[in-house]
Amino acid sequence: MSKIHELSPELTNQIAAGEVIERPASVVKELCENSLDAGSSRIRINFIDAGLKQITVQDNGSGIAKDQLNLAFTRHATSKIATERDLFNISTLGFRGEALASIAAVSHVEVITSSDNLGGVRAIFVGSEKKLQEDAASPKGTKISVSDLFFNTPARLKYLRSERTETLKIVDIVNRLALGHPDVSFTLTNNGKILLKTNGRNDLRQDIANIYGHQLAEKMEVLKGSSPDFKITGLLSDPNTTRSSRNFISLLLNGRYIRNYRLTQAIIAGYGSKLRPRRYPIAVVNIELDPLLVDVNVHPTKQEVRLSKEQELERLLTTSISEALDQNSQIDSGLNNLLTPKKSTNIDQLKFNLNKDVVDTVRPVEFTPQVEADKSAEVHETAASFVSLDKVRNDDKYVITATWDENVDKQVQLSPFDEEKDLQGKDDSIISSGDEILANSLPELIYLGQTKSYLVARHDEDLYLIDQVAAYRRLAYDQIFRDLNSENISQQGLLSPLILDFSNVDYLKLKENLNNLQELGIFLEDFGQNSLILRTYPIWLQPDVEKNVRMILDLYLNQNEQDFTKLKAQIAGEITLRQSTRRRNLNPVEAQELLKNLRNSSDPYQDFEGKIIIIQLSENDLNKMFKKDE
């Protein structure tokens, strides 16, 4: 066994760099935070080849004194804390004294700095070793150039993503810094091209416009809230302007960008029922608090923190956001419903969507599910006054369990289709071109009549109840999915071309993938200044073309892997949900045509969300319901 020995300073610096400097964006973050702590009002960042070739950060801050330059590049040397007490009262972004030493350990660093306007110093470090120091003319402030990142740790390079991805990570981190410090002017350039420029006039809305686009910034709501311990400020998107990812929520603590799941959930909770499922707001929320209430000494990146009075802060966030949104809405927030005690039920863990057609005289029935319900399923209360239906999954077949009130001891199991039919192999929501239409599994039904949103039909001796709205949704979904998979998606011209603004990050992603978007029927052209122009659109994007185009682009940007079949299924589902599908009285010809089309659909038994379309009632089932002897 090897003897215990002390590691060399060079090796310990490389180990520390592995925690602090994960990628080029980490270098940008650490250098910009140093500039902010130095009191800079102007920060310029330029990088080449995703930062691997060179990163330069220049500021007009306090600079580094000539006699302290060597110390600045020594591990655990800092001007920001001095005693143990300071560790629990941190008001700066940095404090660990690791950044410059860690950067120098894995790169070539040139620093030019001056703490006054009389003269400065220039130094070069290679792998933690100082190669040169000399006097140099320099205005007050610091300019640091980092080149050949990871030159002496090539294994780190294989863990980096593509050049485009690393570029986007740099843009994202500078965006967050700019949002946290609207009083500082940031300029970010890549290979000489400006990606972000803020004016430093302490105008958060203008900074959001520079990052996310003017169209979005103009519609954002002002957020204000306070308590004895916290002050909350920021801007929020309205509930109709959302994204499919939480990445557009920027949570700032005394100007520091942090990640905190519970606080993020509190922000989302503030929107209550105004948000559609799986949609998230765009929000910039800054929380000011006494540094004694937060511990930032948790992780080297300082993006994870521990908070005192976190529950109090969560409540303040949720309440403040709810009030800010309600001030600009005449619609009562569903958030208040969360405070109303629920009626006793044995299946509180399931979500209910109450059918608005249920008559006032319906008496609620408490019941117990016969098997463990699929937690992802939604349960709908029917218009029947004597039965509630619980949708469960059992051996890949749907079973409807009708349970009577407590005075009736018999139960009836109704199947939406003949249990002998084999429906295995169907995907829940994805249809491929090779799928076989299951026409033979649903018999030809004869229309009998309609009650509200339900059609009544028969085949032989059996009755069938068909949810009209769910049936139309199935047909609409199938049609849109077929259109998305056609070789040539028919287009309709816009009277006035639609100019779409994007965040700088999204613009760069979309600009490189314009050809891929054409496969989705979206033909965009570059319009410059973080904008793309749309001249034509698929007909099924009506009536709100812009909102639907943005939805498609949002889904495309946030897919984990490029799976176009899955993406098209998601798009078809979202478009179907956005189209207005209301129950209406059908004449017999229309009703019979609906039944015919449903029979020829990809799945006549459930819509694309898995909600039941049709229920079968045999004569035996009816006899049991009417308590007739078998």
Curated annotation (Swiss-Prot):
Alphabetized UniProt keyword annotations: DNA damage, DNA repair
**Where is the chain membrane-spanning?**
none
Family matches, as Pfam families: DNA_mis_repair, HATPase_c_3, MutL_C
One GO cellular component assignment for this chain's record is:
mismatch repair complex
Q: Which PROSITE patterns match?
A: DNA_MISMATCH_REPAIR_1 (PS00058)
Which SMART domains does the protein's record reference?
DNA_mis_repair, MutL_C
For this chain, one GO molecular function annotation is: mismatched DNA binding
Which biological process, per GO, is one annotated for this protein? mismatch repair
Q: Per the record's keyword annotation, is Cytoplasm included, yes or no? A: no
Described by its record, this protein's role is as follows: This protein is involved in the repair of mismatches in DNA. It is required for dam-dependent methyl-directed DNA mismatch repair. May act as a 'molecular matchmaker', a protein that promotes the formation of a stable complex between two or more DNA-binding proteins in an ATP-dependent manner without itself being part of a final effector complex.
Mind telling me which HAMAP family this protein's record contains? DNA_mis_repair (MF_00149)
The family assignment reads: Belongs to the DNA mismatch repair MutL/HexB family.
Q: Which NCBIfam families match?
A: mutl (TIGR00585)
Q: What is this protein called?
A: DNA mismatch repair protein MutL
